[in-house]
């Protein structure tokens, strides 16, 4: 009734939502590694995920903590509401990566499952068109639950691994999701499709059912692991730029790759400009 759950830090992220779903609830933060990452790890890193765009990161979903200090003292930090008197120590500890204390319990916010959810895949022949679409969707007044981008190199890996139905010849795809009340979602989808078409989308596919929706998301969430099919090793980069600068930044990444003979795949949270260029290499090859 109070839309809260008390969990221990070792609980796997996805297991919490799986337990809540039959009752009509879920836990929002959904890192791509949610099948294996823990709530405690998420708290330590202040983890986000695809749905950060509309719902925020872990700190927006934690009300309180039970911690053990370096002196061995057990303390209750925060509480059951956001407006606990005093300093926001919960906010200080979330994202501290275990350097300030040991967390033993976490009070998290849970939310109702949306009445309606629509997942779309916009297919583009240029990275510029895809990235310009992202900023215009937000500028139009629509804030989707998620906007993710994958480029051609990543799509090759994802399809070989997951067979999610993504086109192998696209320069980029946008995985977009709208959720909320049924009428509102229908309006959001119409607006999103319109913006995609304005920016020369080859096609916008709307998941026909829950199974297809889950398959689209499986492709995205398994993307990092799938890269192992095209490269034995890679470095993950993590940076944030304004959405309006995505076209320029992605072009520069491409130019740098050409100049230095690098292979780089792009898979990232486009909606909030959170880039994850993956530099592919093989340490067994001299010089790489």
What residue ranges belong to the model's regions?
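C-terminal substrate-recognition/cap domain of FAD-linked oxidoreductases
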Residues: 108-112, 118-287
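FAD-binding subdomain of flavoenzyme oxidoreductases
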Residues: 1-148
């Amino acid at each position: 009734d109070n839309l809260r759950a008390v969990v221990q830090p070792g609980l796997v992220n996805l297991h919490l939502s799986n337990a809540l779903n039959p009752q009509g609830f879920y836990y929002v933060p959904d890192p791509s590694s949610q099948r294996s990452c823990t709530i405690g790890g998420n708290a330590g890193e202040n983890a986000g995920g695809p749905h950060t765009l509309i719902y925020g990161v872990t700190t927006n979903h934690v009300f309180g903590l039970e911690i053990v200090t370096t002196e061995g003292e057990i303390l209750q930090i925060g509480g059951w509401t956001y407006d606990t008197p005093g300093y926001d120590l919960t906010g200080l500890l979330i994202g501290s990566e275990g350097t300030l204390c040991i967390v033993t319990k976490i009070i998290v916010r849970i939310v109702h499952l949306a009445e309606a959810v629509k997942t779309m895949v916009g297919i583009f022949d240029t990275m510029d068109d895809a990235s310009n679409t992202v900023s215009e969707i937000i500028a139009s007044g629509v804030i989707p639950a998620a906007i993710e981008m994958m480029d051609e190199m990543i799509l090759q890996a994802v399809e070989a691994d997951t067979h999610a139905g993504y086109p192998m010849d696209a320069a980029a795809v946008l995985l977009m999701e709208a959720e909320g009340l049924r009428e509102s979602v229908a309006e959001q989808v119409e607006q999103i499709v319109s913006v995609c078409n304005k920016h020369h989308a080859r096609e916008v596919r709307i998941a026909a059912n829950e199974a297809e929706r889950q398959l689209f998301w499986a492709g995205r969430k398994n993307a990092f692991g799938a890269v192992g099919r095209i490269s034995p090793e890679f470095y993950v980069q993590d940076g944030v730029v304004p959405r309006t600068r995505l076209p320029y930044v992605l072009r520069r990444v491409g130019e740098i790759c050409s100049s230095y003979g690098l292979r780089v795949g792009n898979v990232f949270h486009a909606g909030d400009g959170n880039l994850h260029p993956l530099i592919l290499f093989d340490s067994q090859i001299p010089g790489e």
